[in-house]
Design a protein with these regions (language model features):
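C-terminal motif of bacterial Sec signal peptides marking the signal peptidase cleavage site
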Residues: 14-15
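Short cysteine/histidine-rich metal-coordination sites, predominantly Zn2+-binding motifs
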Residues: 144-154
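Amphipathic, charged alpha-helical scaffolds that flank and support histidine-based chemistry
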Residues: 67, 93-96, 100, 104-126
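The canonical Cys-X-X-Cys-His
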Residues: 126-138
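Short, solvent-exposed, charged loop/turn and helix-capping segments
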Residues: 80-97
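Immediate post-signal-peptide N-terminus of mature secreted/exported proteins
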Residues: 20-67, 159
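Sec-dependent signal peptide recognition
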Residues: 1-7
Length: 160
């Protein structure tokens, strides 16, 4: 009988301790969820601004046949697209984002081939696709174009 009582007492203590641990874990999870909901999450506009700068830098890198810089810039754009899909899942525009994949791949291929002609045509396709996406997502007022001047004055785009 003492053995049965001891076993029941152990089971009861473990069960009570488990409930206390569950409450502590639930409380901790709630606290972390609140902190997470208040943490910084970049907006779609921030990503798009970033992409726009890299788009312009990509153009000048390609025009100057600075293929290493062009490769860097196209991958910065690709990373930003990936980040949009990770951090802006609540935005309906995300459904249209995949239309950019083929033009990005085309620009990337032109860079790997080091072909100025292919770069120009694929960059034009990329730019037009940006505008098509803007139209499809009711942001047609935001028209992107092939840049006239570099987006920054403190960077050279020629091969050094």
């Amino acid at each position: 009988m003492k053995i049965v009582f001891s076993c029941l007492l152990c089971v009861t203590l473990i069960a009570c301790n488990s409930k206390a641990n569950d409450k502590a874990l639930t409380s901790r999870m709630d606290s972390l969820e609140q902190k997470l909901s208040r943490s910084y999450k970049p907006g779609l506009g921030e990503f798009m601004f970033n992409i726009q700068v890299h788009h312009a830098k990509l153009w000048f890198a390609g025009q100057n046949q600075n293929w290493k810089l062009a490769d860097f810039e196209i991958h910065e754009i690709m990373e930003a697209i990936d980040a949009i899909q990770q951090f802006n899942t609540d935005r309906p525009e995300i459904k249209s984002l995949r239309m950019i994949n083929v033009p990005l791949d085309s620009v990337n291929a032109a860079i790997q081939q080091k072909s100025v002609a292919s770069f120009k045509s694929s960059f034009t396709l990329l730019t037009n696709t940006c505008n098509n996406c803007h139209q499809a997502t009711e942001h047609g007022f935001n028209q992107i174009k092939i840049p006239d001047s570099p987006p920054v004055s403190n960077q050279t785009f020629t091969v050094q």
